[in-house]
Amino acid sequence: MTLYLQTNCHQFLLRKVLYLLPVLLLGGGCPLFGQVNADAVFVPISKYIYEGDAEKLSAWFYDTVELSVENEDAVMSRSQAYRMMGAFFERHRPESFQIYHSASKSSVKCVVGKMVAGGENYNVSIFASNRGDGYMIQKLQIQKE
C-alpha cells in the first residue's frame, strides 16, 4: 500500500512538473522566467552598462524612455536619460554586470540582471521593443538590492 501511494504521488508530481515546464521555459509573460541566454540586442547594451558608458547606452534609448534609477522614476527624453545615467555612472562606477534572465513576447524583449557598482548591488531590468526600425530601450530600471 505504501509503495502504491508513493508511486501515485511521484506520478502526480511528475505530471505537474511536465505541465508547468513549458510555461516556465517560455516565460509565461513573466520577465523573471525564460531563456538564460540574452538576445543579441542586449549584448551591446550590457557592454555599455558594464563600461558605464552613458553616451553609447543612450543611443539605444527611444526618443522618450521610462527610466527608474534609485527610486527616481520618470518618462524623459533621450538627452535627459543620458544625463541621468551619466550622473549615476559617475556616482556608482560599474564593476560587473550580468544578465541572468531573459524573455520575449511578440515585439518586446526584456532581461533582468545584476550589477555591482560602487560596491553596491543593483537589480537591473531592461525592456526593449521593436517599432519597425529595430529594438530600442523603452524602459530601464536600476534599483539597489
Residue ranges and their predicted role:
Residues 13-14, 20-47, 59:
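Short, low-complexity N-terminal intrinsically disordered segments enriched in polar/charged residues
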Residues 66-74:
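A short gly/proline-enriched turn/hairpin at secondary-structure junctions
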Residues 1-14:
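N-terminal secretory signal peptides that target proteins for export/translocation
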